[in-house]
Amino acid sequence: MAAAMAAVIALPAAAQEQDLTVLPPAQNGYQPKTTEWGEPDFRGGWPIDHLNGRTPLQRDPQYGNRIFLTDEEFAERADMVAELAKRYENEDSSGTMGIGHWAEVAAANRRTSWIVSPANGRLPGFTAEGKRLADAMRSTWRRNQPWDWTTDFDSWDRCITRGLPASMFPVMYNNGMRIFQAPGLVAIQMEMVHETRLIPTDGSPPLPRQIDMWLGESRGHWEDGNTLVVETTNFKPGPSITNIGTTGSPPENDTPLSPQAKLVERFTMTGPDSIVYDMTWTDPVVFTAPWSARLDWVRDDEFEIFEYACHEGNEQIRNYINTTRHDRAQARESSQ
């Protein structure tokens, strides 16, 4: 496991010696073992906790088109991450950590952002319709927004879903991923919000476009004996496609989607314990251009996924609504 992790961290270092603006292609010479029914075997635990080392979804403009940090910049980030980890260690050793381990700090990464296209590493601009849809979104993360009913909360607030592609990016906690396979089917279990993606690979036709779902409707196929390609459409409008829990995401959970949204993913196994995850999101109604990101997954079959006990109907939603009603009542009384 340590060797696999070292390979993931070392790869950007090698690229850094060449051109910091170039992302090397995923190595696809590795041929994984096959399942009992002859498909590439991706089964196992693939948590993405190790990606939670302060690399943002979107690149800080100071880095321009650079995909990787310089040695000096990486050392600065590593020091910052080490300081965060030290605070945890101090609390842990003194017995005052409490529930602190619900969030973990990973080792620093040399990447300037998870987004690799556009070249500036940032989400493309909204179209006029995209801006209108974003302005209409509701969430507990939106500033100065009242909460009058459940429609004023997003699907993550209500413990329903983080949606896609947000669910595929690291956050501060619950980063477990596990892949299961059966003949003609791949399932990806996600720890956050206890969801599972079901991806047919048997060539069955997709569902009609009028049937939409929170995680969309996926169809997959195998390429080169080591790559799972997944295309997902039929997304149910509602969730923000980015999530504030991912460092560097828009801060108000207000990145919308339209019925034309499409997600294309490539899971390439580059070694027995490594997968390169590439994704491209296209939604011409919302964005002025497609955007793409890359993450490196590392196998950890010992990672345990426990119950995610957040559920719709818990006290938080009621408390938000009651607080808004209380504030409105106070405002009426003071105006009389």
Give the location of each predicted region.
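Bacterial N-terminal signal peptides
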Residues: 1-10
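PEST-like low-complexity, intrinsically disordered acidic/proline/serine-rich tracts
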Residues: 14-336
